[in-house]
Amino acid sequence: MSAPDSITVTVADHNGVAVLSIGGEIDLITAAALEEAIGEVVADNPTALVIDLSAVEFLGSVGLKILAATSEKIGQSVKFGVVARGSVTRRPIHLMGLDKTFRLFSTLHDALTGVRGGRIDR
């Protein structure tokens, strides 16, 4: 998938769960690449979608908007979770209250377990 230099998007299937791993910066310049990647994955009608922001270095307001729009678009038809840790990603998601809109996880392992309906040990 072609993307601007300041973002990387990797799509993988983890036993039926679509995982988008994002790296770099999510801003006005890279937003279209992220929206395109999410659109392609959602078009395949996955049962669950995890967006992994572990390698994101900057999460602008447009990225928060994309996450909220994705959650709204897929509704209850697709289980949805976001991996965010650290102040770059987790803090803005929490401050905007988006952690009440979609499930937020600290690790990919927890996200995969969570969207599959499993128990997450803390």
From Swiss-Prot:
Domain STAS residues, every copy: 7-115
Reported modifications of this chain: Putative phosphorylation on Ser-61 may prevent interaction with RsbW.
Keyword Cytoplasm: no
Positions carrying Phosphoserine: 61
One GO molecular-function entry: anti-sigma factor antagonist activity
Keywords carried by this UniProt record: Phosphoprotein, Transcription, Transcription regulation
Stated consequence of mutating residue 61 to E: No longer interacts with RsbW
Subunit structure: Interacts with anti-sigma-F factor RsbW (UsfX). Its phosphorylation may prevent this interaction.
Similarity annotation: Belongs to the anti-sigma-factor antagonist family.
Name of the protein in question: Anti-sigma-F factor antagonist RsfB
Annotated organism of origin: Mycobacterium tuberculosis (strain ATCC 25618 / H37Rv)
Gene name linked to the record: rsfB
